[in-house]
Amino acid sequence: MRGDFYKQLTNDLETARAEGLFKEERIITSAQQADITVADGSHVINFCANNYLGLANHPELINAAKAGMDSHGFGMASVRFICGTQDSHKALEQKLASFLGMEDAILYSSCFDANGGLFETLLGAEDAIISDALNHASIIDGVRLCKAKRYRYANNDMAELEARLKEAREAGARHVLIATDGVFSMDGVIANLKGVCDLADKYDALVMVDDSHAVGFVGENGRGSHEYCDVMGRVDIITGTLGKALGGASGGYTAARKEVVEWLRQRSRPYLFSNSLAPAIVAASIKVLEMVEAGAELRDRLWANARQFREQMSAAGFTLAGADHAIIPVMLGDAVVAQKFARELQKEGIYVTGFFYPVVPKGQARIRTQMSAAHTPEQITRAVDAFTRIGKQLGVIA
């Protein structure tokens, strides 16, 4: 029986390779930044990191992290409720809550844990969760852990969301929660949060938003998609990460009203049974929020880069998804083509990743490019030139 198990895994791996669905992990030997070094020693320009503000290797963050270790040590060796809560953890939680316009916040090891520990803690079998079809895997998995009745609506489809809300209310749900990404990360599309909040008000539902791909750079002050959509104060729960725009290390959080956060501290299993966030990450994250609040220079640079890339790629004839975001997917359709395109781009000094099933639906393979404030206009033009050459070679564009 054990032999059959390993044989099955071997066959599955071989099938994934044969179908072009096997994900290779490429090695980076430098710090994460716009210009990186890979295993063969070559220098490439990175267009696939979540390093939106270009802060992953910023000297001010590195110095803040070092200072955090000097003052508070390397690790906590404890969960929060035993002996793993330092003053800096509370300071970061308060700063996150204030920045997001919420009453309180709670830190997790990752946003995956924040979402994984949210739904089953707050909702039960008498309740209902209505989830966008393109929500992140962490929301999907978190909802699966919950006993609440589950509904799903087509991506950003307000008519279908309203139909699901009616179903849930007619079925007698005690509490109804709408769960959505703030930005759908495979498409670079911002959720229609005004429509969601309007329907939530109409049907007396709660709204939860995972804003991992927005906080720090989306909205006038970088507060996220709820600021961009002018619904601050109308979203009940915001989850997010410290591992993308806010420094790119690790850590997640949930921000909400105080009673929600306090109940999560009492019952959320990933919070109760995971080590506290490391002091270096906490200190650097506080510094990041200070930098974001200090001015719009990095955000302005990011959006200028996104506009340049989208305009030049569209002019070259590529089909692009999304809008108004630093995620700009280049649609290719075929998984094998997406992988070959990515390999050829790396030879040209452009570092990207092909995305394909099961990460995206079959037939919708793509290269998801991500702009950074750290990119220069010259680097963006170089990337577009490489895309254009290879696109013509592979028959993607004329």
Curated annotation (Swiss-Prot):
Top-level lineage group: Bacteria
Matches recorded under SUPFAM superfamilies: PLP-dependent transferases
Catalyzed chemical reaction(s): glycine + acetyl-CoA = (2S)-2-amino-3-oxobutanoate + CoA
Gene designation per UniProt: kbl
Sites of N6-(pyridoxal phosphate)lysine modification: K244
NCBIfam families in the cross-refs: 2am3keto_CoA (TIGR01822), PRK06939.1 (NF005394)
PROSITE patterns in UniProt: AA_TRANSFER_CLASS_2
Keyword terms of this UniProt record: Acyltransferase, Pyridoxal phosphate, Transferase
Documented EC number(s): 2.3.1.29
Cofactor(s) of this protein: pyridoxal 5'-phosphate
PANTHER family per record: 2-AMINO-3-KETOBUTYRATE COENZYME A LIGASE, MITOCHONDRIAL (PTHR13693:SF102), CLASS II AMINOTRANSFERASE/8-AMINO-7-OXONONANOATE SYNTHASE (PTHR13693)
The name this protein goes by in its record: 2-amino-3-ketobutyrate coenzyme A ligase
General function of this protein: Catalyzes the cleavage of 2-amino-3-ketobutyrate to glycine and acetyl-CoA.
Assigned GO CC terms: cytosol
